[in-house]
């Protein structure tokens, strides 16, 4: 929703410029930025960073807990975070900012976050949920069509989950090239 329209505009304006896109966790993206192997990173909060980085929030989003058809009976109830532990949970892997975010939420409720399935990237969570392998937290805007079609179901939590942000991160000590600067500013 954020990146693809910008890439489309950039490609139309600069059809001869090649783009390399990496898909990784926020900590891995920040390490790539620190090492200089990427010009800038689009990451999700929470973001831990050094003073050498500038982080700009570009869009807020809300995660929602979702399940597949075999657990659809849960959608009729209001359930607490603690009740989620009775069902298999799917999460990004330990060391990701998303894992840390949910670990903190569970800890605030006196619980240990222990997902049954951990995946390397967020795009793997939805297929696992659709195939009834557990409950996952996903950005609401990314699953709206799947919710409307009845492929997956949103669970109603007692607890409020804080909004998160999509951010652009860049190294203040490194000047962006013309192409990277144009892309970032779109």
Task: Place the predicted regions along the sequence by residue.
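N-terminal winged-helix
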Residues: 1-14, 18-23, 27-31, 175-178
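Short beta-strand-centered segments that line the small-molecule binding cleft or hinge
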Residues: 5-9, 26-63, 67, 130-133, ...
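Ligand-binding cleft/hinge of the Venus flytrap
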Residues: 6-15, 82, 99-112
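Short beta-strand-to-loop elements that line the ligand-binding cleft
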Residues: 17-24, 44, 112-121
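A ligand-binding cleft/hinge motif common to bilobed small-molecule-binding domains
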Residues: 44-51, 104, 122-152
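Flexible hinge/capping segments at coil-to-helix
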Residues: 52-89, 93
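Secondary-structure junction motif
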Residues: 73-74, 88-109, 176-180, 184
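A late-sequence structural motif
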Residues: 153-186
């Amino acid at each position: 929703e954020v990146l693809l329209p910008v890439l489309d505009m950039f490609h139309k304006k600069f059809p001869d410029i090649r783009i390399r896109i990496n898909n990784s966790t926020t900590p891995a993206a920040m390490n790539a930025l620190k090492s200089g192997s990427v010009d800038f990173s689009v990451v999700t909060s929470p973001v831990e960073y050094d003073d050498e980085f500038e982080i700009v929030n570009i869009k807020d989003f809300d995660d929602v807990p979702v399940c597949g058809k075999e657990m659809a009976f849960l959608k009729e109830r209001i359930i607490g975070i603690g009740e989620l532990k009775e069902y298999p949970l799917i999460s990004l892997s330990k060391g990701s900012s998303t894992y840390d975010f949910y670990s903190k939420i569970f800890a605030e409720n006196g619980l240990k976050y222990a997902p049954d399935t951990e995946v390397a990237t967020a795009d793997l969570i939805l297929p696992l949920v659709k195939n009834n392998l557990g409950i996952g937290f996903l950005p609401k805007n990314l699953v709206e069509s799947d919710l409307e079609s009845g492929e997956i179901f949103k669970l109603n939590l007692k607890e409020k989950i804080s909004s998160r942000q999509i951010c652009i991160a860049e190294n203040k000590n490194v000047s962006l090239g013309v192409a990277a600067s144009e892309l970032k500013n779109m």
